[in-house]
Amino acid sequence: MSINPNPSFQEVVTKVLKENYVNCEGRARRYEFWMFVLFEIIVGVVVGFIVGFLIGLLGIKSLSFLIYVPDLVFLCPSFSLVVRRLHDIGKPGIYVLLAFIPLVGGIILLVFMCTDSVPETNEYGPSPKYGNVNPSSLNIDPRNMSPTP
């Protein structure tokens, strides 16, 4: 397994939208997750400006529904990416349902999305960050990711 430590922004977006659109199997790194979140924000802002401009130019307020099109397009890949991100930290994908608990669920998921990868291979596959390595061979304590003496 070859590991690309820093895939480009375009590679991440292409991977999420083409290869893993509805794939909930395997693992996804923090880098992949946050690059796709950045892409979603950029697209949302651009679409918002375009829709706002068209509404202002044409005066047709009924076009405002177009602002939700990116949300609908990104719903499936975002869901599957969160599931794969949960897998990467050793949590079951069902935890994605925490998003439906107002405020608290979102905070818990945010903490999970910021958590570093589990370095060892788990039930969801090898680590996309560390590869198929045994952390004990690297003298890494997987609990705190610092070298052991």
Where are these regions (language model features)?
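Membrane-interface extramembranous regions at the lipid-water interface
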Residues: M1-F39, S78-I94, V111-P149
